[in-house]
Amino acid sequence: MIFKLNGQPVTVKCPPAYTLLEVLREELHVTGPKEDCAKGECGACTVIKDGVPVCSCLVLVSQAEGSEIITSEGLVKDGKLNPVQEAFLEEGAVQCGHCIPGMIVSASALLMRNPNPTVDEIRTALSGNLCRCTGYSKIISAVQEAAKQRRR
């Protein structure tokens, strides 16, 4: 299988029934996406596939053939965090950190499509990402702040 991962072409040899999450973590050693529920319900494994956030635990690696995959690691450019990552830190939206890569990927995908989302659009974009530690108000504030920073 050949696809782009965080801007770089990768080739993996594995059974086509492996999930994208299995390949990312076990074959390519990308640790941002996490396996929690393995049912696509928690969002911890969210990646951007061809511009759309997807649960990588539900995507077969064969479905990623020729795709562009972006993980939370791929949002860092030249060692600099992207505006969403920065805003999550500044707004205190991070507690244990387990859900954060998926949250950041979902929020980044939203801002790529819609640079000025409403609170309801942010809630909808993050509705597939669960956080056990914190209320979502700081997370929503972080996405609003990131949108503001991106517009500057």
Predicted regions and their residues:
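Signature of N-terminal electron-transfer/Fe-S-associated modules in redox systems
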Residues: 1-152
